[in-house]
Amino acid sequence: MEQPFNHHGTRQRRMEPFFNSVTRLYHIFFVLLQLYNGQQDMKRIDIELIIRNKAPQLHRKLPRFAIGFMKWLVCQKQLNEILENCEMYEGPDFAIAMSKYMNVTYSVQGLEKIKDDGHYLMVSNHPLGAYDGISYIAVLGKKIPGLKIVVNDILMNIDQLRCMFLPVNTVGRQKRSDMEAIERAYRDENIQMMSFPAGFCSRFIDGKIQDIAWKKSVITKAIDSKRDVIPMYFKGRNSLVFYGLEWFRRILGIKFNIGLILLPWQMARYARGKHYTIVIGDPIPYQTFDASRSHTEWAQWLREQCYNLKKNS
């Protein structure tokens, strides 16, 4: 009789070569992203050129099929097509043009709840991991001057949207300059802030797609900056391949968030032709978050308020 899977048993040892290959691929992929982050003058994504210029030794060692695979993985062709068709735009106009080019449409409920004279921290679930940030710019960017969204730094590769984003490094140490930029934005009364308090893309948990526990820092930021909090619910999902990879990662005990390697694919391919619904809730005064609960408990309460909006979607 076959023994149950044991992380310390024979079956795991048999999977070690695969585990090591996935880990190496993961590191190479994010090295490329870091290299590309330094190519701010580039108007097109060229994976091979980046490797040749920034990592010549790696370029000499990599076989041609590996470079081709990386181009496919990051959707180089599709992303460059988007840049070519939308490069004349910037900020909200770029997000709107990108959505039109990809035939992505939206339904928005409760937009009137965001008042012009308010001082807000808007929070949302994070089902897509990348394109939901772009979607919010397309929907809210014109309505809310000075909108800044705290996002995965992978999106900083889109030059036309840098003015809207504040980057967070989810796979390494956060840059001091980025941390300081986020702090300045929270203190600026002319900026409306938005964040995804889970910090990671939604997962398949307990039979449904949902965020992991929200970070308590969302409450701390709201109180310290005296911003009322607006919960928002984004109805959408990634491909089954994405969730399958995440399930496979957990089964193998891989700690790295290798699902991130599929985010460009989800954004450039899977999102095409999709319709997303956004539901905006009532502002919650920051004074609500008193000492009756810890910041961690308030963060989970806020998460519940977000998902309660689902019934209106």
Feature locations, PLM:
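Conserved nucleotide-cofactor-binding alpha/beta core module
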Residues: 141, 145-188
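Structural motif
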Residues: 121-123, 167, 192-196
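Short hydrophobic alpha-helical segments enriched in small aliphatic residues
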Residues: 8-9, 28-31
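Active-site pocket-lining segments that scaffold enzyme catalytic pockets across diverse folds
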Residues: 126
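Non-catalytic C-terminal accessory region of glycerolipid acyltransferases
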Residues: 43-47, 176-313
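Membrane-anchoring hydrophobic helices of lipid-metabolizing enzymes
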Residues: 41-123, 133-135, 142-144, 162
